[in-house]
Amino acid sequence: LHVAEARGFLTRTPQRYDLIRLGAQGGTGAGLYALNESYIYTVEALRTYFDHLAADGYLAINSWIKLPPRDSLKLFATAIEALKSTGVADPGARLALIRSWNTSTLLIRNGAFTDAEITALREFARRRSFDTAWYPGIQASNANRFNVLEEPYFYDGTRALLGPNDDDFAG
């Protein structure tokens, strides 16, 4: 266990990790530009984290939820861009996003999620009343079930960001 600013720490070590976890930054009132102010959430930073993941390792990033969704979906979009920049053809196969009423957790796997991992993620979320917003193969009926929002904003956002018109959604 190392408690340090992740990007700076990882640039000083060649070691690979099974899990790299980034906690939510700032308070819930940090505002629209909260992620813009931190260099730990850039495409380049995410690539640094990927470079330090063990085979089948995970990057877990927590963020505060604001409505309409901002930071969680911006982070999801950044992860997609970072994965594509490393040559990953199907970023959605390596991503999962779950949420509670006030936080979300983005999981990025070094490799595609297995069926067993998806089953475990779904069961973990169900037992704790977390909503799933994305995992490979998610169906609309599995989103927005516990902490119900007016619309399944997070599910809709992740689908749009992974779809063919992602630039229209993010732009």
Could you tell me what each predicted segment is?
Residues 1-112:
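Soluble catalytic regions of membrane-associated enzymes that act on cell-envelope
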